[in-house]
């Protein structure tokens, strides 16, 4: 099978990219032909398909006010991405497209590529965050509280709650993006949405995606399993030396939305429990 993998970063930036590259490795090991669509970046892995990658867009670093205004429209819809994606499709001719993180740097404009309509190529999307439901990605509002206000598909809640980086302007732009994607029916062009947990699937279903979601836990490659076994065996030895004291293990990026404060807050209930990060 010819499978086109899409992700806005083509280097190991975070968990989504770890999944993306491991998926490519696994698919190739099973004999599938894999191509890539992504964004140009100095840290990118080499790829034959990089000739089709869109130009780099930095919405986080320091850029001039003029540059921010210039790139605001391409954050919502990129004609460059649509054009280059169409050219890649014409060369690779995929049987299926598997999208990962695409918003803002690539945009869902790629789903308007004429090739997809002509050839009815199925599109799969793996949800690595809550961008389909929440302009801020996290379902946490500007006050730091868990929030599901935008499940009603009225995304201007993000403006009144200043949900994006403490900025009303950025919140407005993110809300405009979400409203545009709703009115443009961009998500109707996705055939299947993979949620890595039942909780996320349930939220997606509440938010209007029922009927096209499945819950599927992220996989582990053989090399990741081997590494995990080595780490586990090391900790078993350490635990034996320390008298096997119970502990809570937090595994993830140290940022508030990942929940690091939750185990910190309850470890005092089970002392002498150790928190390992």
Regions found by a protein language model. Name each.
Residues 194, 241-258, 264:
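Conserved donor-binding/catalytic core segment of Leloir-type glycosyltransferases
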Residues 267-273:
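Conserved small/polar residues in nucleotide/adenosyl-binding loops
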Residues 199, 219:
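Carbohydrate-associated surface elements
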Residues 15, 204, 258-266:
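Active-site helix-initiating loop/hinge in glycosyltransferases
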Residues 7-13, 24-92:
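N-terminal strand-loop element at the rim of the active site
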Residues 227-247:
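Nucleotide-sugar donor-binding and catalytic loop/hinge architecture
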């Amino acid at each position: 099978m010819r499978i086109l993998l899409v992700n806005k970063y083509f280097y190991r930036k975070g968990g989504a990219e770890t999944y993306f590259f491991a998926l490519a490795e696994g698919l190739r090991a099973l004999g599938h032909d894999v191509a890539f669509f992504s964004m140009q970046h100095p840290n990118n892995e080499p790829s034959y398909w990089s000739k089709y990658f869109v130009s780099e867009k930095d919405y986080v670093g320091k850029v001039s006010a003029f540059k921010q205004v210039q790139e605001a429209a391409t954050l919502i819809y990129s004609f460059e991405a649509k054009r280059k994606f169409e050219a890649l499709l014409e060369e690779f001719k995929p049987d299926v497209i598997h999208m990962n993180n695409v918003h803002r740097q690539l945009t869902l404009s790629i789903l308007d590529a004429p090739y997809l309509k002509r050839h009815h190529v199925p599109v799969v999307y793996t949800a690595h965050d809550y961008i389909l439901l929440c302009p801020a990605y996290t379902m946490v509002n500007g006050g730091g509280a868990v929030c599901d206000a935008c499940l009603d598909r009225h995304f201007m809640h993000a403006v009144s709650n200043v949900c994006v980086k403490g900025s009303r302007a950025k919140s407005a732009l993110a809300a405009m993006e979400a409203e545009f994607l709703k009115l443009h029916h961009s998500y109707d062009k996705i055939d299947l949405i993979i949620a890595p947990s039942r909780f996320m699937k349930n939220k997606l279903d509440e938010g209007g995606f029922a009927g096209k979601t499945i819950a599927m836990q992220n996989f582990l490659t053989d090399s990741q399993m081997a590494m995990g076994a080595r780490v586990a065996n090391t900790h078993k030895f350490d635990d034996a030396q320390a008298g096997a004291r119970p502990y809570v293990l937090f595994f993830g990026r140290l940022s508030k939305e990942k929940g690091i404060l939750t185990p910190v807050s309850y470890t005092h209930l089970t002392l002498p429990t150790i928190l390992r990060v």
